[in-house]
Amino acid sequence: MTDKTEKVAVDPETVFKRPRECDSPSYQKRQRMALLARKQGAGDSLIAGSAMSKEKKLMTGHAIPPSQLDSQIDDFTGFSKDRMMQKPGSNAPVGGNVTSSFSGDDLECRETAFSPKSQQEINADIKRQLVKELRCVGQKYEKIFEMLEGVQGPTAVRKRFFESIIKEAARCMRRDFVKHLKKKLKRMI
């Protein structure tokens, strides 16, 4: 027996670990350490530090004189002050004046792309929210009634909407709420 204990003490490679044990710290501990490292080194990284220092210099206005700032902007865009196109890295103009090619049709196309939602989309959103509220535990009927008032369209659409919500409320075992909805439906008709 003493030979085995001496062998284990001398040669740790023969010792088997349990599957749960590992050399690295636990997942939660690693996450905490990573979070602490991020908090401590938030402004210490090369990229963040250089960007922050440039931002601070630009905000204070002490780092770059305005004349150099204009030339740097021109280098970035490729245009000089006389609107001539330039090659990057040189100040020699390439030639020709650059003009804008916007027309009124382009602006109209962009305006129509941001049209408001249709009645059907609005009603579908309201229905999703209503079903979500119905499935929640509790009696928050005021919020549901406010959403039902937001339904858009003719009376027939509103009637179908109320009927579908009544069915959903019955399915969710909300008998008292079904009674309230039926009363509102009768008043609406």
Curated annotation (Swiss-Prot):
Q: In which tissues is it expressed?
A: Testis specific. Expressed in cancer cell lines.
Q: Which family does it belong to?
A: Belongs to the CT45 family.
* PANTHER family in alphabetical order: DEAD/H BOX POLYPEPTIDE 26/DICE1-RELATED, INTEGRATOR COMPLEX SUBUNIT 6
Q: What is this protein called?
A: Cancer/testis antigen family 45 member A2
Tell me the organism: Homo sapiens (Human)
- The gene name reads CT45A2
